[in-house]
Swiss-Prot record:
The gene is ST6GALNAC2. GO terms for cellular component: Golgi membrane. InterPro entries: Glyco_trans_29, GT29-like_sf, Sialyl_trans. It comes from Homo sapiens (Human). Aberrant O-galactosylation of IgA1 molecules plays a role in the development and progression of IgA nephropathy (IgAN). Genetic interactions of C1GALT1 and ST6GALNAC2 variants influence IgA1 O-glycosylation, disease predisposition, and disease severity, and may contribute to the polygenic nature of IgAN. Belongs to the glycosyltransferase 29 family. Residues 29-374 are lumenal. This is Alpha-N-acetylgalactosaminide alpha-2,6-sialyltransferase 2.
Length: 374
């Protein structure tokens, strides 16, 4: 039997979208809770702990001029103050690599650890991230530092098409983008500023293939732009090492790739950040512990790239705004803002977008996050 054709096909598509939207709306309207911190976890809810933790992941623990500090909103919230641990290291760099860390993380599969991965590859990669700039997301600025770090995290959701949010996005101190971040032709809706580009090698290369004809013909590049590697596999460590050394990838799925084609010709270690596997574990356990983990899709599941970037910003910035992320009326918009024809969002088993949507909704209601909706 062939594929449905003509009016019957469109009727079937509309019915499918309507049913999907109804089911999601019912789920989304339910009260969504998140797993609390494990027994024996450190208490990081004190006012002093929040300021100390900010200093550990950025170049200063400021924020005095902010009209609204997200960490104070966390402190006031009866549920989220028990989930956030702002003292956990966000980034992994050379000084943190010890035999004890190897022994512990080698018990867990990527992206939560190094089980089955080469010690030589991990060690040689981290040895290149040996400067203090590798430990902090925000390097000390050359000029007068802002008194409040305001961050925009830009997802690729269709809600941004026609939004005219570009100027608002660019007004932030730092702008995070990810995966197929098409800018040309959509400047009015998504802005032009990019401070950080987050990805796994897999999502980056898949985006270049899948969205090439839609305008994503190269990874964002720029003198002050930095890249955040999500270590989902050994290939992320191999690509990162090759990028810093300025040599072709010597092995694996990306053998022969020239990193400068992705990241530009002058890509020193200071251009790259690496998320800590412990940080990804913490985010998954406390915020995005999906029921998919206990199914036969468990080995596939991990938080989406957008979720990891948004939660990274929430652990390092003073104010965070999210654009292009899933909302309760997602079915009104195309999957991505740069698509020429309406394409419904598909829920794949490797991410739990329903759980992520509920989290963004609740963080927005708590005043911890400003979620763009329309």
């Amino acid at each position: 039997m062939g594929l449905p054709r003509g009016s019957f096909f469109w009727l079937l598509l509309l019915l499918t979208a309507a049913c999907s939207g109804l089911l999601f709306a019912l789920y989304f309207s339910a009260v969504q809770r998140y797993p609390g911190p494990a027994a024996g976890a450190r208490d990081t809810t004190s006012f002093e702990a929040f300021f100390q933790s900010k200093a550990s992941n950025s170049w200063t623990g400021k924020g005095q001029a902010c009209r609204h500090l997200l960490h104070l909103a966390i402190q006031r919230h009866p549920h989220f103050r028990g989930l956030f641990n702002l003292s956990i290291p966000v980034l992994l760099w050379g000084d943190l690599f010890t035999p004890a860390l190897w022994d512990r993380l080698s018990q867990h599969k990527a992206p939560y650890g190094w089980r089955g991965l080469s010690h030589q590859v991990i060690a040689s990669t981290l040895s290149l991230l040996n400067g203090s700039e590798s430990a902090k997301l925000f390097a000390p600025p050359r000029d007068t530092p802002p008194k409040c770090i305001r961050c925009a995290v830009v997802g690729n959701g269709g809600i941004l098409n026609g939004s005219r949010q570009g100027p608002n996005i660019d007004a932030h101190d730092y702008v995070f983008r990810l995966n197929g971040a098409v800018i040309k032709g959509f400047e009015r809706d998504v802005g032009t500023k990019t401070s950080f580009y987050g990805f796994t090698v897999n999502t980056m290369k898949n985006s270049l293939v899948s969205y090439w004809n839609l305008g994503f013909t190269s990874v964002p590049q720029g003198q002050d732009l930095q890249y955040i590697f999500i270590p989902s596999d050994i290939r992320d460590y191999v690509m990162l090492r090759s990028a810093i050394l300025g040599v072709p990838v010597p092995e694996g799925l990306d053998k022969g790739d020239r990193p400068h084609a992705y990241f530009g010709p002058e890509a020193s270690a200071s251009k790259f950040k690496l998320l800590h596997p412990d940080f990804i574990s913490y985010l998954t356990e406390r915020f995005l512990k999906s029921k998919l983990i206990n199914t036969h899709f468990g080995d596939l599941y991990m938080p989406s790239t957008g979720a990891l970037m948004l939660l990274t910003a929430l652990h390092t910035c003073d104010q965070v705004s999210a654009y292009g992320f899933i909302t309760s009326n997602y079915w009104k918009f195309s999957d991505h803002y740069f698509e020429r024809k309406m394409k419904p969002l598909i829920f794949y088993a490797n991410h739990d977008l329903s759980l992520e949507a509920a989290l963004w909704r609740d963080l927005h209601k708590a005043g911890i996050l400003q979620l763009y909706q329309r």
